[in-house]
């Protein structure tokens, strides 16, 4: 018994990032050496992601409602500058992907890529309609289905009603509930090393690395664009806001948010992680409690890259020449589509036919491109989610620190 306690204390003294790195390395080894054991270990990953997904909608609803309920008049949340950063970042990602698609034209083999059963949206109007319908969804259904647009809308309305008509005791109860749910999130995050171990070992056991070899150039363009945004464009945007070296903040967000998101492959599941990081960075709670869930819905730089690169690859494969005006239009369409990706089943991949329609590409061909996206999804979806989610907290921090700098001046 004493040995067990001392072992747990010893593990507890090791930083969580190092524990995750150990879980990652062990997962790669187990998944490669013993696929059967790796698949069995996948249960730990499923439980971890399931726990995060389960707590995230409740956390967002209660935290936002509590924040608004206790919001004092004259104490602004400063959300607008963050939304502007989200849109700038997403458009920059789409434009970068267009340029990369022109400089490094990619042809893909479509025959035998597989079938995709889900139906893509027919146009921008349908994407926007989906977002608006999510806004007025039943609040219970919104929480049950992790509809964050609906959750945010109802939490804002309920919080405003409590602020104006609730008693001090009622508002304190809601605040205590928010603190309790945040504590539960901390407990879940402590199991991240075990969860990452399960996710990695099962992924390696199921797919190996061979399935990705045939699409190496396409993956290189996708990952290259995402790396350029994460390590060049985003730091430039952050510097513009805070006017000092942005890389310590950038690397902190990539390390403490991006790593989780890469393996969970879920922006929703990463909301609690981003909330905890924002609190650790000392950001304004009234701001991050709203901007981070909102970012998980509309801040989609990774999705914009995926939509654009695969649409450009489809055009090159079909022998279509893309002029600059069309490429610029594609950037705008990809930006709007990416912002609506959370409202579409299948996310960014099923918005590819929408972008392909700009080039007059047949829907059957576009859906084969989507199927290719699912094949490379093991890497593409992980990298996309890591970029999307880490940027949520990065831009929130940049806007908050920039506001503090302006106030100090």
Swiss-Prot record:
Keywords assigned: Amino-acid transport, Cell inner membrane, Cell membrane, Membrane, Symport, Transmembrane, Transmembrane helix, Transport
Biological process annotations from GO: serine transport; threonine transport
Subcellular location: Cell inner membrane
InterPro entries: Na-dicarboxylate_symporter, Na:dicarbo_symporter_sf, Ser_Thr_transp_SstT
Main location: membrane
Transmembrane segments: 24-44, 48-68, 82-102, 142-162, 194-214, 218-238, 292-312, 319-339
Catalysed reactions, semicolon-separated: L-serine(in) + Na(+)(in) = L-serine(out) + Na(+)(out); L-threonine(in) + Na(+)(in) = L-threonine(out) + Na(+)(out)
GO MF term set: neutral L-amino acid:sodium symporter activity
CC annotations in GO: plasma membrane
Its membrane topology: Multi-pass membrane protein
Physiological role: Involved in the import of serine and threonine into the cell, with the concomitant import of sodium (symport system).
NCBIfam families documented for this protein: PRK13628.1
Family: Belongs to the dicarboxylate/amino acid:cation symporter (DAACS) (TC 2.A.23) family.
Record-given protein name: Serine/threonine transporter SstT
Gene source species: Neisseria meningitidis serogroup B (strain ATCC BAA-335 / MC58)
Organism phylogeny: Bacteria, Pseudomonadati, Pseudomonadota, Betaproteobacteria, Neisseriales
